[in-house]
Amino acid sequence: MASSAGLALCGHALVVRGGSRLLATSTSSSDGDSLFIYDCSAAEKKSQENKGEDGQPVDQGSDTVLASTFSKSGSYFVLTDDSKRLILFRTNPWQCLSVRTVVRRCTALTFTASEEKILVADKSGDVYSFSVLEPHGGGRLELGHLSMLLDVAVSPDDRFVLTADRDEKIRVSWAAAPHSIESFCLGHTEFVSRIFVVPNHPELLLSSSGDCTLRLWEYRSGRELHCCPLTSLQEPTEPWSDKRFAVSRITYWSQEDCVALSCDGLPVVYIFQLDAAQRQLVPRQLLTFQHRVWDAAFEEGHGLWVLQDCREDPLVLYRPVGGQWQSAPESAELRRVCAHVRVNWAMLEGCAGVDSGFSSLYKATCDNMTTYLKKKEERLQQQLEKKRRQAPPPGPNGPTKKMRAGELAQGCSS
């Protein structure tokens, strides 16, 4: 899957990634003008043992970052790239701790709540765990699906591992015994693009899909609590209103029980309120932008940061004012962070025409009745054409009339 630009926030730490590079800085003025840049193309690579007929290594990656995330406390940051590497960082101060190899290209990753392990989901449907405490240790196979995994999450108490796949399923497995399945959350009609366990309501799960819905679940029982079609919230006059899309990011603000969604490069961000008591999602606002939105993330107590495809204003900060989310006035911190991104804009230039790779995951529609009627019409046309070729040519006075056998004999004797 291709990867567009990404944004991650934890505490005051902010990371922007694009191509093979990541840029880490701080949103706090007290941290000074801190800046950390890492390029995966400069990281160590495992020697390629498999070679093609020409003797050259095969299956070389482009070092593009495919997924990344912070640990719960923000002490660690991890990324994976399409050269099949898992790169772990310490964030205070920023330092690369290890570069490890994964079996297959990864689609999603997460830390356990204890921050002792990293769970990595890959394209073949497997989840591997890697130790944080032993940063150079190898991976361990934990569980597997029969189809591609698109996201992985853990419950806040580390008891359950939740996985989302291409075949519309969300599986809830026991972390201590992943072969033991607690439940399935079934209801989506397309691939499940993102899942998110609500941290301050740990029994609840949010999920999104290629079916353009956001759903709320009680995941241990597999019970769907609420379904919100995103297409019902957009204006039909928008140029992208008839486009099929999937949510590429679910981000959450615990302080206000607020959910924000960015959608596969569309110039919008959906805002919802989670009503945990009523077990429902309440649509609050649809933020629209002049440029495509790459990613969005909440900074607790500060607001919603939005990364967009605009070199002049790559980052926009929104805050709630009178019940509505509005663009915050430009501050010294915002100017400083945007300046860092502008200087390093080259890492984002290749992301301009790249989506999150969901377009190839939709089910192929098969209209059997249309195919049947088309083939039937072709068959009738062929039969008519065959009869036309077999019919005798018309005489000078029109088509020749067929004669009965008796008439033919009488005509011959006269």
From Swiss-Prot:
<feature type="repeat" description="WD 1">
    <location>
        <begin position="60"/>
        <end position="99"/>
    </location>
</feature>
<keyword id="KW-0158">Chromosome</keyword>
<dbReference type="Pfam" id="PF00400">
    <property type="entry name" value="WD40"/>
</dbReference>
<feature type="repeat" description="WD 4">
    <location>
        <begin position="187"/>
        <end position="227"/>
    </location>
</feature>
<keyword id="KW-0819">tRNA processing</keyword>
<dbReference type="GO" id="GO:0006400">
    <property type="term" value="P:tRNA modification"/>
</dbReference>
<feature type="modified residue" description="N-acetylalanine">
    <location>
        <position position="2"/>
    </location>
</feature>
<dbReference type="GO" id="GO:0106004">
    <property type="term" value="P:tRNA (guanine-N7)-methylation"/>
</dbReference>
<dbReference type="InterPro" id="IPR015943">
    <property type="entry name" value="WD40/YVTN_repeat-like_dom_sf"/>
</dbReference>
<dbReference type="GO" id="GO:0005829">
    <property type="term" value="C:cytosol"/>
</dbReference>
<comment type="function">
    <text>Non-catalytic component of the METTL1-WDR4 methyltransferase complex required for the formation of N(7)-methylguanine in a subset of RNA species, such as tRNAs, mRNAs and microRNAs (miRNAs). In the METTL1-WDR4 methyltransferase complex, WDR4 acts as a scaffold for tRNA-binding. Required for the formation of N(7)-methylguanine at position 46 (m7G46) in a large subset of tRNAs that contain the 5'-RAGGU-3' motif within the variable loop. M7G46 interacts with C13-G22 in the D-loop to stabilize tRNA tertiary structure and protect tRNAs from decay.</text>
</comment>
<dbReference type="GO" id="GO:0106143">
    <property type="term" value="C:tRNA (m7G46) methyltransferase complex"/>
</dbReference>
<comment type="similarity">
    <text>Belongs to the WD repeat TRM82 family.</text>
</comment>
<protein>
    <recommendedName>
        <fullName>tRNA (guanine-N(7)-)-methyltransferase non-catalytic subunit WDR4</fullName>
    </recommendedName>
</protein>
<dbReference type="GO" id="GO:0005694">
    <property type="term" value="C:chromosome"/>
</dbReference>
<dbReference type="GO" id="GO:0005634">
    <property type="term" value="C:nucleus"/>
</dbReference>
<keyword id="KW-0677">Repeat</keyword>
<keyword id="KW-0853">WD repeat</keyword>
<feature type="repeat" description="WD 2">
    <location>
        <begin position="101"/>
        <end position="140"/>
    </location>
</feature>
<comment type="pathway">
    <text>tRNA modification; N(7)-methylguanine-tRNA biosynthesis.</text>
</comment>
<dbReference type="GO" id="GO:0008047">
    <property type="term" value="F:enzyme activator activity"/>
</dbReference>
<dbReference type="InterPro" id="IPR036322">
    <property type="entry name" value="WD40_repeat_dom_sf"/>
</dbReference>
<dbReference type="InterPro" id="IPR028884">
    <property type="entry name" value="Trm82"/>
</dbReference>
<dbReference type="InterPro" id="IPR001680">
    <property type="entry name" value="WD40_rpt"/>
</dbReference>
<dbReference type="GO" id="GO:0043527">
    <property type="term" value="C:tRNA methyltransferase complex"/>
</dbReference>
<keyword id="KW-0007">Acetylation</keyword>
<feature type="region of interest" description="Disordered">
    <location>
        <begin position="377"/>
        <end position="414"/>
    </location>
</feature>
<comment type="subunit">
    <text>Non-catalytic component of the METTL1-WDR4 complex, composed of METTL1 and WDR4. Interacts with FEN1; the interaction is direct.</text>
</comment>
<keyword id="KW-0539">Nucleus</keyword>
<dbReference type="GO" id="GO:0006974">
    <property type="term" value="P:DNA damage response"/>
</dbReference>
<keyword id="KW-0227">DNA damage</keyword>
<feature type="repeat" description="WD 3">
    <location>
        <begin position="144"/>
        <end position="184"/>
    </location>
</feature>
